[in-house]
């Protein structure tokens, strides 16, 4: 086990390296949205909307996709107000949990672009409805996979086929979650799909090297907004206890973190330092972001992550009697 002195020195090196990072040329990145067709699922709210605004300001042609056509059209008007002449800004209304609708949506978006595949695909669609597993219905379990995994997997599949058939390079960016690395009580209908999304992204990062298509994955923590508010309405008390002290960041800050990682050429992109130790403990052998910094984080994670896990498990045990009483009041038990 590392000595206290070693941990202190590691912490100093990590902090110093972190603040020096903006001045270090880690790797070349060809990320430049100017003039590119950027296709954003879940683009009518939250991270997707904030990202769309940033991309329009950088001169990109933007297509947003969402279920609510009226809401999406309203966002398009906002985007057009900040766009320059010649930028193509449009929306597509579609239920992306359907493979047919996903295919039709991306092809419709490409019509104004001579049917060429999008340059950048940002997969921001998804939702979270935390509940205890024993109180979750079978349909809710299925909805969790549909609304988190398949809603992105179908679009990613069609985008990969379009790009490769047309021999076009491009980028596909999955938006996963901190809960793609680690999970705990309350997220049994959500984190399995996020784990699956990370598995798909890892596989495609390797496979798409055959076609010169770049794959990235963004793993943020909580993002403030209507989606986060809806999540909290069903979130069990034990889950809130484990997350106590976590402050969600705004969609604008989150979008900035995503683009910062893309500009640095990172494969796995996070939005705060808290996620870094978890990323290094669970990265599945994918490329690191920076060898030196990641090595230091790995040392810290060898102590920090087990402590966090023990703390989380202790919190769950402390709720055992309370949950049992609540379930009993609902007539859950058979004896």
UniProtKB/Swiss-Prot annotation:
What top-level branch of life does the organism fall under? Answer: Eukaryota
Q: Report the transmembrane regions from the record.
A: 288-308
Entry-linked SMART domains:
PKS_KR
Q: What class of enzyme is it?
A: oxidoreductase
Q: Where is the signal peptide?
A: none
Give an example GO molecular function: NADPH binding
Which keywords are on file for this protein?
Endoplasmic reticulum, Lipid metabolism, Membrane, NADP, Nucleotide-binding, Oxidoreductase, Sphingolipid metabolism, Transmembrane, Transmembrane helix
Region of interest (Involved in homodimer formation), ranges: 141-207
- Catalytic activity line of the entry: sphinganine + NADP(+) = 3-oxosphinganine + NADPH + H(+)
Q: Which GO terms describe its cellular component?
A: endoplasmic reticulum membrane
What Enzyme Commission number(s) does the record list for this chain? 1.1.1.102
- Topology in membrane: Single-pass membrane protein
Q: Where in the cell is it found?
A: Endoplasmic reticulum membrane
Q: Which PANTHER family match?
A: 3-KETODIHYDROSPHINGOSINE REDUCTASE
Subunit info here reads:
Homodimer; a minor portion forms homotetramers.
Q: Write out the function statement from the record.
A: Catalyzes the reduction of 3'-oxosphinganine (3-ketodihydrosphingosine/KDS) to sphinganine (dihydrosphingosine/DHS), the second step of de novo sphingolipid biosynthesis.
Protein name (database record): 3-ketodihydrosphingosine reductase TSC10
Origin species: Cryptococcus neoformans var. neoformans serotype D (strain JEC21 / ATCC MYA-565) (Filobasidiella neoformans)
